């Protein structure tokens, strides 16, 4: 893994709807608030379902080996659509993409509440992923062009904190609704409609532009840089490890102590509390003191410690503490990754590069069950030790290369 030295941005104006102001304005804060609300829904695409996942597995009689694919299906379509929407942002306008995908998120997500079979829910999850990819590509592209340098890292931290806060609330809400019936959790996707309405009122309307072939060519050149490739691989790795907690921790707690959907929701929420706290108040400071590589290394090592303790922790209070530690690590890793990608991307290619980063993170979540599912099926709790070993290895490599 690698750290990336900052390069001065090229003097090209971004192709997104918003020019980057030198100082935050009232309007930019309003835009930031809308982007955070939209991003919260996108980040909660999996968190809504995770607490009721054991009930879904039981209802459909799914094999434990591949059951995680149901939770992670949306991440594959998110990965694919993030790249497409990122490249289309200059042609269709980021705001237009964002608003339409928010509506799609609400509609497609709600289908899960009425789907009659496993394949219907799976198809619904795939479409939710498409919408989530558009939300993420539009949101992070606009955000990256609102601020520069250290301010961007700080704002990325605020955004990560908001997204993590959403994944505090949504698992608890999903788990609470799941006490009545697991289908009720899918109703939370309907929140995409009011957020789309707020966005329609507050976000500037982008202009339709012609196709931007040079942007695609420029992105291809950037992707040939070894540092960028390593960052994207690390993003995918972090997300794959993240989904070990999302998918297999609830299944383990269900088996070990017959945990309810509400308890699973609180445990998942504790992870998000840690991410919210460190992303809001610590990610930029740790990065400034240790460098991006040092901050990323510290985050991975915290994730490893948390994962290694899961099999031996059965007290609710200790479960929450383990989740909190994992969240602290994840909250250090992600904003520094995205900020590093933004720093080495010219203005005209930044939205596309960050969309690819989002896609790689989603791809990591999708492949997680294929990598760790067989370990869970054959060795049970060894899946947590395996993920911890991978996280520790990535952390050490980043520390050595910082």
What do these predicted ranges mean?
Residues 16-24, 204-231:
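Juxtamembrane intracellular "pre-TM" segments in multi-pass secondary transporters
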Residues 61, 93, 114-120, 148, ...:
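Helix-breaking motifs and short loop linkers at transmembrane-helix boundaries and internal kinks
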Residues 80-119:
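Conserved MFS/SLC helix-loop-helix module at the cytosolic interface between two early adjacent transmembrane helices
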Residues 82-93, 278-291, 376:
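Helix-to-loop junctions at the C-terminal end of transmembrane segments
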Residues 104, 108-111, 119-127, 317-325:
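Paired small-residue
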Residues 118, 124-163:
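Cytoplasmic helix-loop-helix junction between adjacent transmembrane helices
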Residues 149-150, 157-202:
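Helix-loop-helix hairpin linking two adjacent transmembrane segments in secondary transporters
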Residues 344-381, 387:
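A late C-terminal transmembrane helix in Major Facilitator Superfamily
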């Amino acid at each position: 893994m690698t750290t990336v030295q900052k390069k001065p941005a090229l003097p090209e104006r971004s192709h997104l709807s918003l020019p980057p102001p030198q100082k935050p304005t009232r309007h930019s804060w309003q835009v930031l608030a809308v982007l955070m609300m939209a991003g919260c829904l996108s980040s909660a695409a999996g968190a809504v379902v995770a607490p009721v996942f054991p009930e879904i597995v039981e209802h459909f009689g799914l094999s434990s080996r591949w059951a995680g694919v149901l939770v992670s299906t949306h991440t594959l379509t998110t990965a694919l659509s993030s790249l497409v929407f990122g490249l289309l942002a200059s042609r269709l306008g980021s705001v237009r993409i964002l608003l339409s995908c928010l509506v799609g998120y609400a509609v497609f997500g709600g289908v899960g509440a009425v789907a009659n079979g496993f394949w219907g829910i799976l198809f619904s999850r795939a479409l939710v992923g498409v919408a989530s990819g558009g939300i993420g590509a539009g949101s992070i592209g606009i955000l990256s062009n609102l601020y520069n340098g250290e301010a961007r890292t700080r704002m990325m931290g605020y955004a990560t904190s908001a997204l993590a806060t959403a994944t505090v609330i949504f698992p608890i809400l999903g788990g609470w609704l799941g006490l009545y019936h697991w289908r009720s959790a899918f109703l939370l996707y309907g929140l995409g409609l009011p957020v789309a309405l707020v966005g329609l009122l507050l976000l500037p309307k982008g202009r339709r532009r012609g196709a931007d072939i040079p942007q695609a060519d420029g992105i291809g050149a950037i992707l040939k840089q070894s540092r960028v490739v390593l960052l994207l691989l690390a993003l995918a790795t972090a997300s794959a490890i993240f989904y070990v907690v999302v998918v297999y921790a609830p299944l383990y707690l269900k088996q070990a102590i017959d945990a309810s959907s509400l308890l699973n929701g609180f445990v998942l929420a504790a992870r998000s509390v840690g991410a919210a706290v460190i992303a809001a108040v610590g990610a930029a400071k740790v990065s400034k003191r240790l460098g991006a590589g040092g901050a990323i290394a510290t985050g991975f090592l915290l994730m490893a410690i948390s994962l290694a303790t899961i099999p031996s922790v059965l007290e609710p209070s200790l479960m929450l503490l383990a989740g909190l530690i994992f969240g602290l690590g994840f909250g250090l890793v992600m904003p520094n990754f995205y900020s590093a990608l933004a720093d080495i991307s010219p203005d005209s290619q930044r939205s596309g590069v960050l969309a690819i980063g989002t896609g790689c993170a989603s791809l990591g979540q999708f492949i997680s069950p294929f990598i760790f599912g067989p370990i869970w099926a054959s060795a049970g709790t060894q899946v947590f030790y395996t993920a911890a070993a991978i996280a520790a290895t990535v952390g050490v490599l980043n520390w050595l290369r910082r």
